[in-house]
Amino acid sequence: MNGMNTAPYQDFAREKLGFEFTNLDLLITALTHRSYVNEHRKSVHHHNERLEFLGDAVLELAVTEYLFTHFSEPEGILTAWRAALVRTESIGDAGDKLGYGPLIRMSKGEKNGSERAHLQILANAFEAVIGAIYLERGFDDARDFIHKHIIVKLDGILESGSWRDPKSYLQEISQRVDNQTPIYKVLSEEGPDHDKVFTLGVFVGDNIMGRGIGPSKQVAQQQAARAAIAKYKESGEK
């Protein structure tokens, strides 16, 4: 690719994915954010959004197939489990652990973006890498990759109950334990209108049980609810 040093990408493929890409451009494109193309229009022409589109479909199929063949729960439960496995936080965390963050080509502005924005970039790149593996090696290898880095999270998700809608789950717990309904309050609101960051607290009675931060009040509420659920679980409640 235009004289760039591709060795780190092949090293990553060999060490983290377990094989070398015959078409290394696929992997490099999977790790190229749209913003980088915008800054280098003369030399770079492809970003990872098409591969992300493909990888998203492969990821959903592989997870769906695994859940269908290994569990007998009804559709609604399996759908909730799948959603927990493939949500941004889950696949972004998988990407972070794989360690390809430094290899992602992005603009200077994106490099200095919020933690949430960085997590989204990692998650999108993870799906794009799945798409690249699918095109390079086929569905079986893509599925093996997904099992190794995503399906492995399932036991923890089931044990923690994080597959449930966190706000509904918290309300069940708080009403059972404290006979009270959680109340969500905005603690702070920062940033320009196009890049807001909300911090919310969830209160049960006069006690703040959890805090959450997110780009919207809804996301922050969900994070706060998860924190409150974890606090209840630490005290032995389920």
Task: Show where each model-derived region lies.
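Double-stranded RNA-binding/processing signature
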Residues: M1-K238
